[in-house]
Amino acid sequence: MRNTFAALALASTALLVGCGDDDDDMTPDAGTTYNPTGTGPGTSLRCTSSNKNAWDTFGANAFVAVNKSIVAKTLAEVGGPKGTTNLGESFTHIGDASKGPAYADDAATFEGKLAAFLVYAYGGPESITYADGKMYTGPQNMAAAHVGMAITASQYDYFIANMVVPALTDNGVTAADVSSCFAPIVTDAAFKASIVGK
């Protein structure tokens, strides 16, 4: 699960790079005094509610809450009656290095890496100190993080639609902001391809 999130994070980064404008410096956006915090791929995306990127709109507490919600929803699904039917087995092997390097991180590290990736990808700083008190780096290689997981396109789509989007909306992100400043990264074909089938 941790590696899937890492993969998601990396894929999101790749997508954001592809979707971003060329304004990677820290100068204010044209016609505004808004100076984005980060330099990640989603820095140039703008939320409908604020005309700022997701990180600058929602902040650290919201990102932690959404991240924890994604993890909780995913673990509840694979541990519940549906089991691995929709998400596959990748989340059931977190912390089991015998399944391959993509699974080596324990659950806490997986969660921290996912959070750092999401923060960076959506316009925040390149590294964060997470709720566990440890420092995590956001820029990650999604393809490498998902090697051996054999995630299918339908599993990926299910994860985004049934774990990620509800985690966002349950934590106060409007549908308009999901569409404007979160979805472009995870729905990008190149980002998805960096995770699926590895």
Regions found by a protein language model. Name each.
Residues L15-G18:
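C-terminal motif of bacterial Sec signal peptides marking the signal peptidase cleavage site
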Residues G20-D22:
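Bacterial signal peptide processing site
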Residues A11-S12:
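Repetitive helical segments and hydrophobic/amphipathic motifs
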Residues M26-K198:
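Core of compact, soluble alpha-helical bundle domains
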Residues M1-L8:
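Bacterial N-terminal signal peptides that target proteins for export
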